[in-house]
Regions:
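A ligand-binding cleft/hinge motif common to bilobed small-molecule-binding domains
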Residues: 93-96, 235-254
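A bilobed periplasmic-binding-protein/Venus flytrap-type ligand-binding module shared by bacterial periplasmic
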Residues: 145-151, 186-189, 268-279, 298-299
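Extracellular/periplasmic juxtamembrane helices and adjacent flexible linkers that interface
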Residues: 293-347
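Early extracytoplasmic/lumenal segment of secretory-pathway proteins
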Residues: 32-96
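N-terminal secretory signal peptides and thylakoid transit peptides that target proteins
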Residues: 2-19
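Extracytoplasmic ligand-binding site segments that recognize negatively charged/polar headgroups
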Residues: 69, 88-216, 221-224
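Periplasmic-binding protein-like
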Residues: 49, 167-182, 201-211, 219, 249-275, 289-313
Length: 347
């Protein structure tokens, strides 16, 4: 979900920094001068929890912000992880990093706050390699069904509503190959939407090709989807993320979102321990600090991300559906998905 990931963060935080941002150290360091080096997305090392961490540890924290998943991987690969202690990326990228030997396992015994993880995030298979944990779930969101509440007084229960000819030319679908094929796989009931068989691919192609005549358009990017929805009397949209709803409301649309019974695609960003970490103890201390419920509260209230520890704050924000999402994993053949998606759009 590389392109959508970039668009999502740009929409939430404005233009992303592509250069290193070094955060000021305390005026007086403690006896042991220590530095934590983090490679992450904007919004994941905020003053609300960063300042407390620096105060508690006396450490300097250097943060580098990545502008895309590819840039993040290149920065890690360039030094075999030696330039960073911590990195953060979503669940679909674990095999890539593990295969490149850029990560090391996390010792759960060093994370007393691990108990704070909400149940749906405590057992995410994608962060495990055998019995070893390689990721700590931190922030999440979804690609939900967005609808006009004037057309739907009650939320649609199934994605099949986007094949209802009654709403022909009043529906939008995101132009993203991997996300589209994955959702199509969920809708047709594939056993694993990220490891499709030839039969699964055939069913997805038939399903999505049959839908094309009902769509007003495919759209690319958060703003494109919001503008097309608001300007054309759209009733239903395969959304690029939760923030499209408040953006539509600002334009006068009575919009809401739902997660249909077939589930929806979910992204789950995690903290990972670099294979080249110089201060492993300090890196684990950061992870443990990020498991504090106060951090989850700030993450959700400031940036509208779902958090993995503070259930009450998620509930207040309406983010109560983590257990109804299919967390992104590495696809069986990304190039095949792109080719199929192009066939569907051309068909």
């Amino acid at each position: 979900m590389i392109l959508t990931t970039v668009d999502r963060r740009r929409f939430l935080t404005g233009s992303l920094a592509t250069a290193a941002a070094t955060l000021a150290a305390p005026a007086v360091l403690r006896a042991q001068d220590r530095t934590l080096r983090i490679l992450t997305w904007e919004g994941y090392a905020e003053p609300e929890w960063l300042d407390k961490f620096k105060s508690d540890t006396g450490a300097t924290v250097n943060v580098v912000y990545a502008g895309s998943a590819d840039e993040m991987f290149a920065k890690m690969q360039g030094s075999q992880g030696a330039d960073f202690d911590l990195v953060s990326f979503d669940t679909s990228l674990f095999p890539r990093y593990v295969d490149a030997k850029l990560l090391q396992p996390i010792d759960p015994a060093k994370l007393p706050n691990l108990k704070n993880l909400a149940p749906e995030f405590a057992t995410v298979k994608a962060v495990m390699q055998g019995e070893e944990r390689y990721g700590l779930p931190f922030a999440w969101g979804s690609l939900p069904l967005v609808y006009d509440t004037e057309a739907f007084p009650t939320p649609p229960e199934s994605w099949e509503v986007m094949w209802d000819e009654k709403f022909a030319q009043q529906m939008l679908w995101q132009d993203d190959a991997n996300n589209s094929i994955t959702l199509g796989a969920l809708i047709v009931g594939a056993a694993n939407p990220y490891k499709l068989t030839d039969d699964d691919f055939a069913k997805v192609k038939e399903k999505l090709t049959g839908q094309k005549k009902f769509l007003l358009s495919y759209y690319a990017g958060f703003d494109d989807g919001v503008n097309l929805f608001a300007q054309n009397g759209i009733k239903l949209m395969y959304s690029m993320g939760e923030p499209q709803v408040p953006a539509l409301v600002k334009k006068g649309v009575k919009a809401a979102l739902t997660i249909p019974k077939e589930k929806a695609v979910g992204w789950l960003d995690c903290w990972e321990l670099s294979a080249g970490a110089k201060d492993k103890e300090l890196a684990l201390a950061w992870m443990n600090a990020c498991l504090d419920g106060a951090v989850g509260k700030a993450l959700t209230e400031k940036h509208n991300y779902g958090n993995t520890t503070n259930v009450d704050v998620n509930k207040a924000a309406g983010l109560t559906y983590g257990d109804k999402l299919s967390w992104l994993e590495t696809a069986e053949n990304y190039e095949k998905r792109v080719a199929l998606w192009n066939e569907i759009k051309a068909g």
